[in-house]
Structure formats: C-alpha cells, structure tokens
Amino acid sequence: MIKVLVIADTHGQNQRWIELKNYHNPDVIIHAGDHMTTKQFMDQNATFWVAGNNDSIGNEIEIFQLGQINFVLMHGHQAPRDNLKKWYQLLVLKAQQYPCDVLIFGHSHIEYTNKINMIQLINPGSLQLPRNQTNTPSYCTFIVNKDELTDLTIHYYQASKVS
C-alpha cells in the first residue's frame, strides 16, 4: 500500500505543503508544477515533480509507475486552456503518447477528478492561489494497492485540521 499526497501551484509558499507532509505522512509526494522554489527543496520534499509555466527548473513531463499503475505528470500549460472541457481532452491526448493510467496536472488552480478515455485525471487545485468557487485551497490524496488506485479524495485545506 502506497499513500500518496498530490499538490500543485504552491507558488513559492511552502508552509502548507510542509504541514500536509507532516500531517498525512505520505509515502510519495507529487507536485504538479508552479512550485517556484529551488531544486534542493523540491528534491527534499517531493518524490515526483515537474516545472510549471512559472518555474525555471524541472522537467515538463514525468512518467513513472507506482505499483502497477502508469502515471503521467505534467503541469497543464502544454495545452491551451480556453475551455476547461476541451483542455482536459487535449491533456488526455498528450498523456496518451505514453503508457498512462493516471494523468496528474495543475495549472488551472481548480480541483478536478474524472475519467476520460479510461485515464483517471487528477488536478489537486492550488494550495496557495485557489480559483475554485469558494476560493478554498485544495490538494489530493489517494492510495495505490498494486494495480488499483483507491481512496481518491480532494481535500480542502484548513489550518486547524493540520496543525
């Protein structure tokens, strides 16, 4: 069993990220870009991470496997975001260039989970600059059991529940 924490769009403000790391004690931390911090910090605090459109370090795409599940990680700025529904489809097309069961991305600052063309999409939203309807910071957790992703949950950050 692998416990996973997914965050994105922290924009150089890392306090909540570290709080969540300590609170959830995950086996794996995934950051979907716009971290705006140093490589040293990223390497110490994220297992897998990519560069966003505001980052000067990191790869555009990371391909990895947890258990028997194939992941594609990208920020999301690799496709135009004029219309969210169309944007999701374009990101799936990009992810399908690789073995992909799960696509993790950020960029919109809006949390989202859905399955498109047999690919599980996960956008954790933003821990610092949310653009969801309630302007509430968000992140995601899930568990990998061999070939199964379970307990996929979008969480809304509340300092009182993590400190």
Curated annotation (Swiss-Prot):
State the needed cofactors, names only: Mn(2+)
Which positions does UniProt annotate for Mn(2+) 2 binding? D34, N53, H75, H107
Q: Does the keyword Lipoprotein apply?
A: no
- Which molecular function term from Gene Ontology is one that the record holds? metal ion binding
Q: Cite the binding residues for Mn(2+) 1.
A: D9, H11, D34, H109
Q: Which UniProt keywords apply?
A: Hydrolase, Manganese, Metal-binding
Instruction: Please give the name of this protein.
Output: Probable metallophosphoesterase MG207
Q: How is the cofactor bound?
A: Binds 2 manganese ions per subunit.
Query: Is Hydrolase a UniProt keyword of this protein?
Result: yes
What protein family does this chain belong to?
A: Belongs to the metallophosphoesterase superfamily. YfcE family.
Please give the PROSITE patterns that the UniProt record associates with this protein. Answer: UPF0025
Q: Which domain of life does the UniProt lineage start with?
A: Bacteria
Q: What is its EC number?
A: 3.1.4.-
What would be one Pfam family of this protein?
Metallophos_2
